């Protein structure tokens, strides 16, 4: 029925939980199929797919693992009687103003289950993730316009990222001579390798944001009934860049909160058994509980991402010649290093701020420009280094890729994967825009060239347009002769 166990598990943790939650708690059918999602996930773990491309299997594994963690919370962690734990609510700010009763009719129960399973960050429920103060557009038209601008901006970023990666791949493979020989030398630099790894993360994250923006624009534009058609149900996926002034703030405010519930729920459950109710705790137990939750959340996050690599690392077919044989790869669990180290960094950061009396409140930090700037610099440095060294390198190694199989290829596999990721979603309008603009550019370029103005400025403009136009390096050598 399904091509492999992973695909079956993905269907099992999306469709079946909705059916289970739609049925009365006393239903025999509900009892019968209740363990089925867990069994399908267990089957995928014990008998993972062994054929196919590692990258595709990794992405499918990440999606399945993410969804299964979420459904584990809804179905098993909170107990059999989900309607008693998950409540639809109305809010004004962070205050719950109304609690809706569980529907009595079958159709209402199906809608209730579907709303819970598809809820974004628990919005409209008592499990809603804390949101930053959001200023929503004043009208539906303004909201649609804002979404369109975001979509076009993301498409432009993906197009530019993919084009640059194609450019660098041809340089590394020496498929054409480049007027910029220093580009090849950049890939021997560890810092630039980190930047390249960061581009891969950008492409993957941008695809998620793009899909999210398309979905919210369609739902709000169509005026679909229920929570999906409300503007308030679709806040921006990420916080503001200006809030990335500390490691804790990056994870708590700037980064997306889509997984927050499923990552924190296991720790919350264990801490409630150990510490009891938080308001009743003394200062020291409350502090211990606070950091226990931080460590447990990142522990679950590391496991989630590692399991995705576990599936990808089991595939035999590798798309690059520099692939490492299956028996020589490091363990799939090395991917979790990046996430396991984050709570230690946050704890150290908190201790230093406490010991030096440095403000950790958003208003206090932003009021002092030096404090904000220093925080932004060290945070960006930490994530640029950590993403490459603690995440990308171990993950690629476990999937079979070597960091530098030889001095010439180096990071070519990351660039190829990033380019493919940047072009995976269709309907990108920018290639057509560049193709349309090109004739006009050449006319203007010829005019200024004939007038003797420009120099290297026009060479750079020429090269940029050729890269974005997808013509590669076949014209770059001749471009150097125009100055």
Curated annotation (Swiss-Prot):
Pfam families assigned: MBOAT_2
Transmembrane spans: 9-29, 33-53, 141-161, 191-211, 292-312, 334-354, 372-392, 453-473
Knockout-associated phenotype: Does not lead to any change in metabolic profile of A.oligospora grown on PDB.
Gene Ontology CC: one annotated term: membrane
Keyword ATP-binding: no
GO biological process, one term: terpenoid biosynthetic process
Enzyme Commission number, as recorded: 2.3.1.-
GO terms, molecular function: O-acyltransferase activity
Pathway: Secondary metabolite biosynthesis; terpenoid biosynthesis
Induction remarks: Expression is down-regulated by the cluster-specific transcription factor AOL_s00215g275. Expression is also down-regulated by the HOG1-MAPK pathway downstream transcription factor MSN2.
Membrane topology field: Multi-pass membrane protein
Keyword annotations of the record: Acyltransferase, Membrane, Transferase, Transmembrane, Transmembrane helix
Subcellular location: Membrane
InterPro entries in the cross-refs: Wax_synthase (IPR044851), Wax_synthase_dom (IPR032805)
Main localization of the protein described in the UniProt heading: membrane
Recorded family membership: Belongs to the wax synthase family.
Function: Acetyltransferase; part of the gene cluster that mediates the biosynthesis of sesquiterpenyl epoxy-cyclohexenoids (SECs) such as anthrobotrisins and arthrosporols, metabolites that possess a novel hybrid carbon skeleton consisting of a polyketide-derived epoxycyclohexenol combined with a terpenoid-derived monocyclic sesquiterpenol substructure (PKS-PTS hybrid). The SEC pathway plays an important role for fungal soil colonization via decreasing fungal nematode-capturing ability. The role of the acetyltransferase in SEC biosynthesis has still to be determined.
Name this polypeptide is given: Acetyltransferase AOL_s00215g273
């Amino acid at each position: 029925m399904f091509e492999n166990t992973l695909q079956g598990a993905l269907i099992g943790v999306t469709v079946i939980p909705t059916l289970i939650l739609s049925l009365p708690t006393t239903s025999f059918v509900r009892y019968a199929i209740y363990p089925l999602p867990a069994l399908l996930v267990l089957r995928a773990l014990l008998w993972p797919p062994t054929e196919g491309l590692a990258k595709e299997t990794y992405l499918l594994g990440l999606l399945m693992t993410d969804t299964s963690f979420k459904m584990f919370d809804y179905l098993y962690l909170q107990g059999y009687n989900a309607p008693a734990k998950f409540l639809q609510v109305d809010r004004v700010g962070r205050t719950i103003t109304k609690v809706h009763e569980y529907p009595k009719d079958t159709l209402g129960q199906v809608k209730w289950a579907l709303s819970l399973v598809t809820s974004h960050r628990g919005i409209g429920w008592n499990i809603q993730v804390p949101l930053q103060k959001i200023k929503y557009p004043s009208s539906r038209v303004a909201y649609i316009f804002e979404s369109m601008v975001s979509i076009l901006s993301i498409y432009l970023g993906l197009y530019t990222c993919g084009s640059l990666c194609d450019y660098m791949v041809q340089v590394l493979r020496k498929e054409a001579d480049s007027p910029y020989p220093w580009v090849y030398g950049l890939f021997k630099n560890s810092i630039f390798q980190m930047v390249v790894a960061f581009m891969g993360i950008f492409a993957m994250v941008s695809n998620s944001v793009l899909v999210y923006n398309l979905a919210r624009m369609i739902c709000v534009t169509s005026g679909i009934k229920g929570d999906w058609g409300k503007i308030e149900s679709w806040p921006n996926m990420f916080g503001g860049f200006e809030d990335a002034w500390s490691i804790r703030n990056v994870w708590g405010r700037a980064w997306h909160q889509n997984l927050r519930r499923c990552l924190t729920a296991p720790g919350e459950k264990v801490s409630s058994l150990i510490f009891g109710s938080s308001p009743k705790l003394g200062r020291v137990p409350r502090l211990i509980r606070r950091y226990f939750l931080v460590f447990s959340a990142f522990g679950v996050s590391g496991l989630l991402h590692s399991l995705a690599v576990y599936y990808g690392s089991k595939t035999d077919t590798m798309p690059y010649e520099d692939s490492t044989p299956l028996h020589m790869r490091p363990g799939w669990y090395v991917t979790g290093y990046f996430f396991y180290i984050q709570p230690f960094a946050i704890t150290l950061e908190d201790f230093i701020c406490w010991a030096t009396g440095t403000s950790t409140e958003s208003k206090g930090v932003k009021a002092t420009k030096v404090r904000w700037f220093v925080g932004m610099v060290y945070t960006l440095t930490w994530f640029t280094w950590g993403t490459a060294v603690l995440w990308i390198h171990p993950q690629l190694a476990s999937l079979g890729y070597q960091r530098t199989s030889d001095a010439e290829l180096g990071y070519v596999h990351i660039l190829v994967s990033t380019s493919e990721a940047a072009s995976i979603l269709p309907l990108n309008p920018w290639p057509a825009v560049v193709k349309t603009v090109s004739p006009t550019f050449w006319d203007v370029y010829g005019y200024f060239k004939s007038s003797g103005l420009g120099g290297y400025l026009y060479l750079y403009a020429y090269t940029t347009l050729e890269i974005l136009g997808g013509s590669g390096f076949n014209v770059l050598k001749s471009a150097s002769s125009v100055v």
